[in-house]
C-alpha cells in the first residue's frame, strides 16, 4: 500500500481487479433497482461525469445505489441526497486533497479506483419509501433511516451469501 505523509493512497489500479467480484445479474435485490445514470471517468480533470438516464431519479433524494462496471458490482451505497450530489462528493476524492488529508478515504478510494479502471459505471438505484416523522409538531419525510437500513440489509446479505462485501465498500 502506497503511503504519503502517513496517509493511505491505496485504490484499485485496473479493471482486472474486479474479476472476482459478484456479477450484478446474481444480485438478489436487482428487481428493485433501475438504471438511474452512468458515470463517465474524466481522468484529465480527475472527476466523474454524471450522464443521466432518468433525470428525475438522478436528482431524487434518498437512494440506495449499486455501482456496476462491466457487469461486476463495485459498490453498494446509500445517500440521503441524490446520486448526482453523492457523485459530487466522490469528486472531492482528488489525490491532492488526500495527500493534504482533506478528503475522506471513501471518496478518495472510489474516485481514484473508477478513474484508474477507466470504464463507464452503471448506477442502479432503489428509492425506499420515505418514512414520515413528526418533530416539534411538524411532519417531515426523511430518507436517512430507510435508505441506511436498506444499505445495511443488502451488505449483510451480500456478506452472508458471498462471504465478502463489494470491493468498493471500504467502510466497516
State where each predicted segment sits.
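Boundary/linker segments flanking structured domains
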Residues: 1-62, 68-74, 79-172
Amino acid at each position: 500500500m502506497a503511503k504519503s505523509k502517513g496517509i493511505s493512497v491505496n485504490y484499485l489500479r485496473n479493471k482486472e481487479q474486479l474479476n472476482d467480484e459478484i456479477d450484478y445479474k446474481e444480485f438478489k435485490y436487482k428487481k428493485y433497482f433501475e438504471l438511474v445514470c452512468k458515470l463517465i471517468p474524466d481522468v484529465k480533470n480527475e472527476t466523474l461525469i454524471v450522464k443521466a438516464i432518468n433525470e428525475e431519479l438522478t436528482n431524487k433524494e434518498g437512494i440506495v445505489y449499486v455501482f456496476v462496471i462491466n457487469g461486476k458490482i463495485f459498490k453498494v451505497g446509500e445517500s440521503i441526497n441524490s446520486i448526482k450530489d453523492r457523485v459530487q462528493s466522490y469528486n472531492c476524492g482528488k489525490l491532492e486533497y488526500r495527500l493534504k488529508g482533506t478528503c475522506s478515504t471513501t471518496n478518495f478510494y472510489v474516485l481514484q479506483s473508477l478513474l484508474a479502471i477507466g470504464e463507464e459505471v452503471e448506477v442502479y438505484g432503489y428509492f425506499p419509501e420515505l418514512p414520515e416523522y413528526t418533530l416539534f409538531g411538524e411532519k417531515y419525510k426523511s430518507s436517512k433511516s430507510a435508505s441506511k437500513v436498506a444499505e445495511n440489509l443488502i451488505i449483510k446479505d451480500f456478506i452472508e451469501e458471498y462471504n465478502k462485501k463489494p470491493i468498493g465498500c471500504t467502510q466497516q
